[in-house]
Amino acid sequence: MKILRGVSRQMCTSRPEVRVRFAPSPTGFLHLGGLRTALYNFLFSRQRRGVFILRLEDTDQKRLVPGAAEHIEDMLEWAGIPPDESSRRGGDYGPYVQSERLHLYTEAASSLLNTGHAYYCFCSNQRLELLKKEAQRSGHAPRYDNRCRRLQPQQVEQKLAAGVPAVVRFKLHTGTEEFQDLVFGWTGHAVGAVEGDPVILKADGYPTYHLASVVDDHHMRISHVLRGCEWLISSAKHLQLYRALRWTPPTYAHLPLLLNRDGSKLSKRQGDIFLQSFRDRGVLPETLLDLVTHAGSGFSDNRMGRRLDELIRDFNISKITTHSALLDLDKLEEFSRLHLQRRIEDPQQCVWLCEELKQMVKHTHSSEISAAAVLEPEYIERVLQLRKGHISSLQDLLSSTHSYLWVRPRVSQTQLQSESAHAKDIATAVMQMVLAGGSLVSMERLSSELKQISSRTNSTHSSVMKVLRLLLSAQQRGPSVAEMMLSLGEQEVCVRLQKALEL
């Protein structure tokens, strides 16, 4: 590999505008850890009227997953935190895919070679593997010995002319590189004292992360880099690269890791951490945003229930601690109930929920639907208002426990008689009560009138409730009988009670 010489260095430029980026590798689909990083970048940019960029770091071509790039942006849009600039949306600083920016990395590497900050390395994979094994045998961390630093210019030219495969390595200096991180404060790392010179451009012309991220952040005018703390030590290398290229580095903020509740790392092998999995289960996007921010820091208080506009308002980067954030997925149902309730209570959101649930009911129950009325917006909204706080997703209303809402139950005379000898008397008394009007006005009024049925039918209140639950739902458990009746409405309750009298 031969790099053209004589490329001019780009001088530093000012960056008055806040520009942040989420730069995942499309080697997999978006999971909760990536969502959290993207969200913090989004919140930071929105607070400062800045720009949120999606950049795809696809230089590791062997590990690319088909469809992952498109899926990542799909999930950001679904979560309500779409990028302002991306390969899909365009922008003034594209391309937004690293494999389409190779000429920029070649130019930067050439500049570093010309100024003596980088050099060609011709060491074979076999030699590098021997160095690694030798270090391990002696109990040291593997590192490159910088052998090719000492090659004379004539030797380099001869090897390049002979077509010997080469990479480009950056010369690390041994001093401590100090900088102020917005999360970790003043920090410094002497990477040159413990690591060998890193590869910045591979033999195939593709850059490594270190060069690509620096070049892209410069050319895309990134003002702040919010990324995982696993890159904290590498920042020392990046700052040396910025200095060598005479560019102004961005401000760094390294976010603590998002871990499982037991302290273990989130793994892509955990199928339940991918956003698509949550979406398929009917989890609302705002639930996940609230869950991942609640798991860590960045807010003055750790209350649950924040929606996106509240997250933007309350986010404070100075409140992010260096401690790992522990994700408790056992709380997902609680978060889901809260956010679904808030949607139900929002008139505009409730209209959307009603239509969504209608389509779900039609798909699930199709020809079994008891009457066209159960697909009317008024009926579905009534169901949602009565069930809010009890359900964590619309899919809960499609479970067998709630099938009575959409399908009339089948009850046999044997079932009815086994429940109570006064079953038909109970059905008659309740139907008369309903037809008299006024009983289905409120839960309190209905519950009060149902208590009077037991004395009128020589039955216990418990027996009355069991009979009504059977006739209305053919189930032994579920919502209260009063709620069932309010949900179904006067006409449907009477239809189901009349069926019992005809047995």
From Swiss-Prot:
Q: Which cysteines are joined by disulfide bonds?
A: none
Q: Where is this motif: 'KMSKS' region?
A: 265-269
Instruction: Return the motif ranges for 'HIGH' region.
Output: 26-34
**GO molecular function list:** ATP binding; glutamate-tRNA ligase activity; glutamate-tRNA(Gln) ligase activity; tRNA binding; zinc ion binding
The UniProt entry, under SUPFAM superfamilies, shows: An anticodon-binding domain of class I aminoacyl-tRNA synthetases (SSF48163), Nucleotidylyl transferase (SSF52374)
Q: What is the catalytic activity of this protein?
A: tRNA(Glx) + L-glutamate + ATP = L-glutamyl-tRNA(Glx) + AMP + diphosphate; tRNA(Glu) + L-glutamate + ATP = L-glutamyl-tRNA(Glu) + AMP + diphosphate; tRNA(Gln) + L-glutamate + ATP = L-glutamyl-tRNA(Gln) + AMP + diphosphate
Q: Where in the cell is it found?
A: Mitochondrion matrix
Where does the record say the transit peptide is? 1-22
| Primary enzyme class | ligase
Q: Where does the UniProt entry say this protein principally localizes?
A: mitochondrion
InterPro entries registered for this protein in UniProt: aa-tRNA-synth_I_cd-bd, aa-tRNA-synth_I_codon-bd_sub2, aa-tRNA-synth_I_CS, aa_tRNA-synth_I_cd-bd_sf, Glu-tRNA-ligase_bac/mito, Glu/Gln-tRNA-synth, Glu/Gln-tRNA-synth_Ib_cat-dom, GluQ/Sye
Where is ATP bound in this sequence?
31, 230, 265-269
Q: State the CDD domains in the record.
A: GluRS_core (cd00808)
Which amino acids does the record list as binding L-glutamate? 21-23, 57, 209-213, 227
Which PROSITE patterns does UniProt cross-reference here? AA_TRNA_LIGASE_I (PS00178)
Q: What is any one of the record's Gene Ontology cellular component terms?
A: mitochondrial matrix
Name the Gene Ontology biological process terms.
glutamyl-tRNA aminoacylation
Its family remark reads: Belongs to the class-I aminoacyl-tRNA synthetase family. Glutamate--tRNA ligase type 1 subfamily.
The record ties this protein, via NCBIfam families, to: gltX_bact
This molecule's function is given as: Non-discriminating glutamyl-tRNA synthetase that catalyzes aminoacylation of both mitochondrial tRNA(Glu) and tRNA(Gln) and participates in RNA aminoacylation for mitochondrial protein translation. Attachs glutamate to tRNA(Glu) or tRNA(Gln) in a two-step reaction: glutamate is first activated by ATP to form Glu-AMP and then transferred to the acceptor end of tRNA(Glu) or tRNA(Gln).
Name of protein: Nondiscriminating glutamyl-tRNA synthetase EARS2, mitochondrial
